[in-house]
Design a protein with these regions (language model features):
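A preference for well-ordered globular domain cores
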Residues: 1-86
């Protein structure tokens, strides 16, 4: 007879969600760096001003999420801008 493993403890779930959050922040670091470099170079930017603002809002939501009362519930993960997912 197979038995399902127990669900993760609250501490384990929080660690899992922090790792997910950290990975999402790391995955967007390059976009932020590229945009800033393009601005400093005076060249056309890959992201529009609106996209960059949305990206920074998303990153702020990721950083603030662990302080939110809904952390670490997966259903309440910050949502990435749709253009970033595509």
């Amino acid at each position: 007879m197979l038995i399902d493993p127990p669900p993760p403890s609250p501490e384990e779930q929080a660690a899992i969600e922090r790792a997910w959050r950290d990975a999402k922040l790391a995955a967007t670091d390059g976009d932020v760096t590229r945009h800033r470099d393009e601005l400093e170079e005076g060249t056309a930017t890959t992201l529009t001003a609106e996209q960059y603002t949305a990206l920074q809002v998303y990153r702020r939501q990721l950083r603030d999420w662990p302080e939110n009362g809904e952390f670490p519930l997966i259903d309440h993960r910050p949502a990435a801008p749709t253009w970033l997912i595509e």
